[in-house]
Amino acid sequence: MQQPQPQGQQQPGPGQQLGGQGAAPGAGGGPGGGPGPGPCLRRELKLLESIFHRGHERFRIASACLDELSCEFLLAGAGGAGAGAAPGPHLPPRGSVPGDPVRIHCNITESYPAVPPIWSVESDDPNLAAVLERLVDIKKGNTLLLQHLKRIISDLCKLYNLPQHPDVEMLDQPLPAEQCTQEDVSSEDEDEEMPEDTEDLDHYEMKEEEPAEGKKSEDDGIGKENLAILEKIKKNQRQDYLNGAVSGSVQATDRLMKELRDIYRSQSFKGGNYAVELVNDSLYDWNVKLLKVDQDSALHNDLQILKEKEGADFILLNFSFKDNFPFDPPFVRVVSPVLSGGYVLGGGAICMELLTKQGWSSAYSIESVIMQISATLVKGKARVQFGANKSQYSLTRAQQSYKSLVQIHEKNGWYTPPKEDG
């Protein structure tokens, strides 16, 4: 969304911009304009990445290089607030989706730290503009970036009535003095090496800066084909971010990536009990094939017959996730084949307390949900309806059935059958 330009500054794009001294990004440095950002800035960026990593619960560095920084302030998860709700008197930024973080961007000129960073926020909320306006009070120092971010995080916590995060105090730790003074005044030999260093750091993605051991353990046990899928997802996310077409939330995306990694490592997945495919490469839309059910069940026999008739011996489920996952359950429905029994409702919705807000827990893993659904279908004596009209299963009908299901059970509670009934 476009904003009126702050006086004395140019507006580079959406959101509000403040915090610099009127210099356009990239201006004021280079020949005749100062030496450009030195090693001190690099160490500031690395310190920020080590403190506010992509898994941080309050503030995250999304990406960083020598001339630009992108970060996110998370509103949910503190002070007993539910997902998607910002506790306290101030509401989330106008025009934002509940649960979305406050996205903040910073342009760093070549004359930093002589010229302070220039900040902007993806919102037209005047309260957020006021937070950035107060940065003009901080004008001097070799670590202006750290000082600015400490003020921003502290003021945002106050604005949303959130407790001050203890990690903010870590921004006060000094950088090695000899590396911020002697190296900033480089010799001619060091100046000749700077372009190579700068080129590397201009493409520095904070999320990818991981210890070799950490990355090895993260990918350990995942097949090459599935690693390629994960890498494609991350590449698409970076491209969407650059195009300004980010979907979902950081919170949900991080959790879904973890769930997918865990599934790819799982013995049940590797053993062929089920398969997972992303619909149109979307992390928020999964097709799950139940490939194996209890071999002693009538459902298993039906699937064997289905294979002979139609060439498919699996039950296809669809999982759709919202931005506030994992605090809300996924919406799960049967896509095919048409089933009777098994707690499957009209349209393909599934009657399970586990899949409602009342019965859901953010601690549940997606694999455990998949296996529970498989067991529930068998216990509910699900059978394939051969010759049934396949069009009776649709997303719209499933959502309608699910809504009615929730309303009924909110009034009457859930019935737990005796153990002898399965």
Curated annotation (Swiss-Prot):
Localisation: Nucleus; Cell projection, Filopodium; Cytoplasm, Cytosol
Keyword Transcription found: no
Residue ranges with Low complexity bias: 1-15
Region entry Disordered, spans: 1-40, 174-221
Keyword Isomerase among record annotations: no
Listed Gly residues bias regions: 16-35
Tissue: Widely expressed.
EC number: 2.3.2.23
Biased composition, class Basic and acidic residues, residue ranges: 212-221
GO cellular component annotations of the record: cytosol; filopodium; nucleus
Biased composition (Acidic residues): 185-200
Top EC class of this enzyme: transferase
Catalysed reaction equations from the record: S-ubiquitinyl-[E1 ubiquitin-activating enzyme]-L-cysteine + [E2 ubiquitin-conjugating enzyme]-L-cysteine = [E1 ubiquitin-activating enzyme]-L-cysteine + S-ubiquitinyl-[E2 ubiquitin-conjugating enzyme]-L-cysteine
Domain named UBC core: residues: 251-415
UniProt KW keywords: Acetylation, ATP-binding, Cell projection, Cytoplasm, Nucleotide-binding, Nucleus, Transferase, Ubl conjugation, Ubl conjugation pathway
UniProt GO molecular function: ATP binding; ubiquitin conjugating enzyme activity
Residue ranges the record marks as coiled coil: none
Positions bearing N-acetylmethionine: M1
Active-site annotation: C351 (glycyl thioester intermediate)
InterPro entries: UBQ-conjugat_E2_core, UBQ-conjugating_enzyme/RWD
Pathway: Protein modification; protein ubiquitination
Family the UniProt entry places it in: Belongs to the ubiquitin-conjugating enzyme family.
Function: Catalyzes the covalent attachment of ubiquitin to other proteins. May be involved in hormonal homeostasis in females. Involved in regulation of B4GALT1 cell surface expression, B4GALT1-mediated cell adhesion to laminin and embryoid body formation.
Subunit (UniProt): Monomer and homodimer. Only the homodimer is linked to ubiquitin through thiolester activation. Interacts (via N-terminus) with B4GALT1 (via N-terminal cytoplasmic domain). The interaction is direct.
Name under which the protein is recorded: Ubiquitin-conjugating enzyme E2 Q1
Organism in which the protein naturally occurs: Homo sapiens (Human)
Record gene name: UBE2Q1
